[in-house]
């Protein structure tokens, strides 16, 4: 199948690549603002634009698909899927339960974690709910052991020790129509995404929890750096969790605390899942601390996205391109 992507792949390596926004492209972007369209803009897609407008164009406008290879072993995305599915099975037990520490400790003692991890592997990777560990390869047994260790030694003991919360939602859709101004007047982008977990904290605020399997990134150089900093300062996990907190705040009228659960680090006694703002010196800031400037930057970014005079340009930071599905087109 031949796909027209609007890019001359014969350009010299030094030529910057950009795609101008013609009428057809503006119509496709209109899906995210049209109330009649089911299309929504996820926090992941929004960050994709912040990091590299051209990558956003390839993925969300031209809708190019990266080649899906059949993985012989569990890759990083599948590892994350298994972990998320196992957590959801376990935490479904405590939805609505205030101060669930004792229940979590009992689940650890009763050996429920390994069973939930096995069920997650069977359903998501083997796609055979009746499978047993006898069907697991060496790699799959290792994945089972690692996920079990992360949950039994990190996530669940952490929550049991800091249980001033009530889980109110798991894998729950959060959405908000964010208003901003374009040349044609005021419109609204339909943001929507699936929050891993939403907690009600004892002090009356909410917490949006995002489970992460990668290396911890909780420090950032102020909210402005997430949008305009050098490549490595634009931290996707922090920007995205702030977007989820914004959607909760705007739809429920309650402040929200962004929390990143980096599962590989949660066995450390000093682990904190809250954001560490090096610009203000604040650790654990709630959304309203950032709301005014954050929403201003979101509005400016959306105004640029919907400005027909601003083409989709490739990012300047080549490090961003290392793991991009489309770097062959850009020759980076």
Give the location of each predicted region:
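Active-site-adjacent bridging/hinge elements
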Residues: 53-65, 121-126, 206-222, 271-273, ...
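Short, contiguous acidic/charged loop-to-helix segments that flank catalytic cores in large enzymes
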Residues: 70-74, 78, 138-142, 181-189, ...
């Amino acid at each position: 199948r031949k796909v027209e992507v609007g890019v001359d792949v014969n350009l010299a390596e030094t030529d910057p690549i950009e795609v101008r926004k013609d009428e057809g492209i503006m119509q496709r972007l209109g899906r995210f603002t049209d109330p009649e369209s089911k299309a929504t803009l996820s926090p992941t897609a929004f960050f994709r634009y912040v990091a590299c407008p051209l990558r956003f164009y390839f993925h969300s406008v031209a809708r190019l698909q990266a080649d899906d290879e059949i993985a012989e072993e569990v890759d990083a995305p599948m590892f994350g899927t298994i972990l998320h599915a196992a957590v959801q099975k376990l935490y479904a037990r405590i939805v609505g339960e205030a101060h669930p520490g004792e229940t979590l400790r009992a689940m650890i003692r009763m050996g429920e974690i390994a069973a939930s991890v096995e069920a997650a592997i069977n359903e998501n990777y083997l796609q055979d709910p009746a499978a047993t560990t006898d069907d697991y390869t060496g790699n799959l047994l290792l994945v089972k052991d690692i996920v079990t260790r992360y949950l039994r030694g990190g996530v669940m003991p952490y929550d049991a020790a800091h249980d001033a919360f009530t889980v109110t939602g798991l894998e729950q859709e959060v959405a908000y129509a964010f208003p901003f101004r374009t040349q044609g007047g005021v419109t609204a982008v339909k943001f929507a995404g699936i929050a891993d977990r939403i907690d009600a904290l004892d002090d009356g605020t909410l917490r949006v929890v995002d489970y992460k399997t990668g290396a911890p990134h909780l420090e950032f150089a102020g909210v402005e750096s997430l949008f305009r900093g050098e490549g490595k300062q634009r931290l996707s996990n922090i920007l995205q969790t702030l977007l989820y907190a914004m959607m909760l705040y705007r739809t429920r009228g309650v402040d929200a605390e962004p929390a990143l659960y980096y599962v590989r680090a949660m066995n450390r006694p000093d682990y904190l899942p809250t954001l560490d703002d090096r610009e203000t010196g604040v650790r654990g800031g709630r959304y309203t601390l950032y709301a005014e400037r954050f929403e201003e930057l979101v509005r400016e970014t959306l105004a640029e996205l919907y400005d027909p005079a601003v083409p989709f340009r490739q990012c300047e930071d080549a490090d961003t391109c290392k793991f991009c599905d489309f770097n062959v087109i850009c020759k980076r």
